[in-house]
Structures are given as structure tokens and as C-alpha cells.
């Protein structure tokens, strides 16, 4: 990004306009088409919200007393990496869920992320979700690095939880606990399954089976789009920085980020 700024300066162009004018229409490294490309939109929206039009082009020309004022912009592009991953989950009759994957947490927040995914998908309080990682006896999953661990193992975990939800719906139907066919309208929350006017706890459902627990496996595999398209998330950052011309003290007055990370 500093090199882009230097090039824009030598070309006599605004660094934001220079970036927009040189936006690629395909991946310059692979030649693949982009699955999506929202960097320009991030830059434009950020510039409007930040007030980029108030920037003085000449370095050192904007000041407030001893404070030299500078505006900066930078682009963010993060590649989407999806690796084959598997997980296994167990829902106990006590209403707690345990998940296993052989990936590790190297400070990337894997325990927290996977707990959140399982809790949200199953409708359980986070305190009733237990994640076990880092054992080769567990299902093979992605490594940890950047964000691909969450995208890969997290997707496999979500798949396992969705399969568990299907099992619970099937049990309720087979036991005659719900009168209508299971649909996507079923809701899960607070350790319960709600279908229409019927609310059943996970504990009730497992007791009906006579089993101490239920298990489900989940997995994710990269599809054709992973090979045919260049996939990224995008962002743009804007900063206003003040530098004391006498002491060299630097103060970051404002930071703004605009991101297109998908849903």
C-alpha cells in the first residue's frame, strides 16, 4: 500500500482515485474471474463517510497550528481459503454438547469461534458447549492460521449441528410428539426445539430414545467454485493523523473501516 501511495504521488494523482482507476477486472495472479469484487465500493463508501474530499493533495499543506494533518487510505484483500474438514458432535441427555476436531488453537480464538457456532446453530447457551481440539484421534480438520480455520472447521461443525437438528426432528416425529412434518420452520433455542406450538427440550427427546447421547458427523469440501473463481473478502481503511512539527508526536485522530466480508 505505501508503494501504491508513492506511485500515485509521482503520477500526480490522488491515492484514492489512483486505486480506483487501476482496479483489476480479474485476478492478476491467476487470470481467474473474481467470485465477487467489492473493493471499489468499499473505497467509495469509505471516502464519502470519511470526508476524503477535504484532503489537501500536497504533503504538509494541511495544518492546525503546530499540528501537521495527513489523510491516508489503504485497501484490504483477504483470500478465501477453504480446506476439507470434518467434525463430530455429541449431544448428551443432560443437554450438553461436545464437539471434536483435530485442529489446534494457536491463539486464533478457535475454541471461542467453534463454541459460538455450535451454540448458535443448536440453540444452546455457550456454557453448555464443550470443544475438544488437538488430538489425532479426532476427525481430521483444517489447520489454524489466519481465518481459514474458522471457515473450514467452522463450516464442518455447522454441518454436524444441522444434522443433529434433523435427528431431533425425526425423533419427535417418530414419537408422535409433533403432529406436522418437520420443516425448516422449526426453531432451536435455550436447549429446546420449537415446532409450531410444541416446545420440547433436548433432554426430553433423548429420554424418548432411551439413549444417553446422540452423535452426528459433519464435513465440508471445497466445491467447483473454489477452483474456478478467485475468492476474497475486501475492505478499505481511512485514517486522519496529526504530527507535531516540533516534537514529532503522532496522534491518530480518526480511523474508519468499510468491509465486504460476505454473509
PLM features per residue range, with description:
Residues 1-41, 45-48, 54-263:
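Cofactor-binding beta-sheet edge motifs in enzyme active sites
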Amino acid at each position: 500500500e505505501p508503494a501504491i501511495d508513492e506511485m500515485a504521488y509521482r503520477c500526480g494523482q490522488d491515492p484514492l482515485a489512483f486505486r480506483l482507476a487501476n482496479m483489476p477486472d480479474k485476478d492478476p495472479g491467476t487470470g481467474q474471474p473474481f467470485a465477487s469484487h467489492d473493493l471499489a465500493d468499499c473505497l467509495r463508501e469509505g471516502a464519502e463517510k470519511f470526508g476524503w474530499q477535504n484532503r489537501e493533495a500536497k504533503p504538509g499543506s494541511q495544518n492546525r497550528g503546530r499540528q501537521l494533518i495527513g489523510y491516508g487510505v489503504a485497501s484490504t484483500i483477504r483470500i478465501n481459503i477453504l480446506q476439507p474438514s470434518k467434525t463430530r458432535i455429541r449431544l448428551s441427555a443432560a443437554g450438553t454438547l461436545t464437539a471434536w476436531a483435530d485442529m489446534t488453537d494457536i491463539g486464533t480464538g478457535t475454541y471461542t469461534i467453534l463454541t459460538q457456532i455450535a451454540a448458535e446453530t443448536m440453540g444452546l447457551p455457550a456454557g453448555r458447549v464443550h470443544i475438544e481440539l488437538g488430538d489425532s484421534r479426532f476427525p481430521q480438520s483444517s489447520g489454524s492460521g489466519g481465518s481459514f480455520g474458522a471457515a473450514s472447521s467452522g463450516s464442518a461443525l455447522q454441518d454436524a449441528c444441522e444434522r443433529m437438528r434433523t435427528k431431533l426432528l425425526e425423533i419427535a416425529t417418530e414419537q408422535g410428539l409433533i403432529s406436522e412434518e418437520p420443516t425448516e420452520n422449526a426453531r432451536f433455542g435455550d436447549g429446546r426445539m420449537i415446532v409450531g406450538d410444541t416446545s420440547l427440550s433436548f433432554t426430553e427427546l433423548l429420554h424418548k430414545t432411551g439413549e444417553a447421547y446422540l452423535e452426528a458427523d459433519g464435513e465440508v469440501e471445497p466445491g467447483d467454485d473454489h477452483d474456478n473463481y478467485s475468492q476474497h473478502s475486501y475492505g478499505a481503511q481511512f485514517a486522519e493523523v496529526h504530527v507535531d512539527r516540533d516534537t514529532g508526536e503522532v496522534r491518530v485522530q480518526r480511523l474508519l473501516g468499510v468491509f465486504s466480508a460476505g454473509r
